[in-house]
């Protein structure tokens, strides 16, 4: 058996109030690079993961720069690599941007106008960008000549609809200006974030309350959006050897004429069953999980799916809902190139393909109750439930009964990736932002829409960039964008203001300063977050440990799950389990579940298990519980809206210590430990 923590970054420790991280060794970075690459079949045994034009390119050479992560991909919504120019060598680029646009779209345009050409990704061509849009009418979006329409997510709050799609970068401004398009947002990166699980959640049939008969979740669909599905593990097979998986959508697979949303490859139950009869099922199907590596003992998705719905046929230990039907979406890393140096620091996926994955699962489920597990997240965003991604999540579950989305709270407690404070009237305030090893980073700050903050970025050597006034942006570099600062006034989704800063690798190691100057006569409160980086996390020198939930974990209608250690008598909170509330003060997470040292199915085995920790392991335990609740309700002829389901989960939760039925909320435990 192997073991792996869901937090694959070095553990931070406090030194003088700051968070310190040990940089990865060269050997570990090489191992990550090799493990992270989705290689052609002639190299890794993987089949059907690359377009045919790439399959002939068998020899891939990793330079030292690639291994060290100093040569990240040049993609539309990322800053370029600075080639160790240093801060003083940067100058303002003569490119004009529309300051009303989403900052990521502004960056895409700045990159395009400075001559950078993006890579093609799983669902976009070169110089296209994935977007989430708020539109007046579906017809206008679907028939627009510049749009490759994706998924319809549902009705938006107030008016219109939420949709996804792909558009050319050079048409972004024109589309954003059209009256039928109310808002346009670029894709945002997201990352992956049993014995004790069954016992602590009360999912053992012997302990069910009288009259509760979920029949193992029979008749309910559990969908998992993650990476890596070991469909040949016996925990996902019936007694007759057939698969419990109704389908797999591999978003990175070679597209066919019937590909969902126009990309990737769908594998049906019949195709999976045929592959299971072969000596090498993964080769026969043309899909399989990544091989094990010194740093990853088993794929994330296989482990997550087993916790929610494995039947124990192979391992001897069933998950929470062993009779449920399973659907898996292997999400594509759409914010990175699928070859070359980008593999060193690849993202898990993106928010557009995430929403399309959930839409696909609900469509496949049809009239059956369905819960979708998302053990992933991101730090950027308003953290108030207003982002188009979160509105999309809400729309997907509000339209029908018996639909739920469960999201891991995140593992950011103690990382130093959140801070907050107040800039006094007409005063200034400095935020320390430490960059280890010249790795760069991404910073996002939100404050009230009736206030105005000017921002200046100061490098460790004292070089100043800015100031940037509200409603303007500043691209800096040497022909290409190396630093990008954007200040948005009146965000369309919530009316608040936002400041975004992107710093490329190799600019300068050390403590950067973000200087805020209040342009109003009233004190201005703010919250700021740093985007997650699993290899060398930048951090605030004076972090605030509240409000560390992942940004999609602040959705209004998703069920958000924290983690505790189910092996210890005191059931302590998992060390890294993120902390609520949301920026607008709502109480999340809803519940917590076992997430530390959880044993479940191991990749590339038919019956093995491995140990992992994190809120990624807690979320599927709750997904399995929801499947049981849905199955019992269906047996009694009842439907559950998402609000009724949330109330039922909170009502059944175990308080620790017991509060006599009082619904006391804890910023990390939620309303209690999830239980039948």
Residue ranges and their predicted role:
Residues 2-213, 218-221, 240-241, 335, ...:
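Autoinhibitory N-terminal propeptides
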Residues 116-121, 340, 365, 369-375, ...:
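C-terminal subdomain of the subtilisin-like protease fold in secreted/lumenal serine endopeptidases
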Residues 187, 331, 356-384, 408-409, ...:
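Short acidic, glycine-rich surface-loop motifs adjacent to enzyme active sites
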Residues 209-350, 367-370, 381, 385, ...:
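Subtilisin-like serine protease catalytic core
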Residues 249-250, 260-277, 402, 415-508, ...:
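Extracellular S/T/G-rich loop segment that most often corresponds to the catalytic His/Ser-adjacent loop
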Residues 305-308, 314, 327-335, 362-370, ...:
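Hydrolase catalytic cores
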Residues 371, 389-420, 424, 673-675:
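Catalytic cores of secreted or luminal carbohydrate-active enzymes
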Residues 521-533:
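Edge beta-strands of jelly-roll/beta-sandwich modules across compartments, strongly enriched
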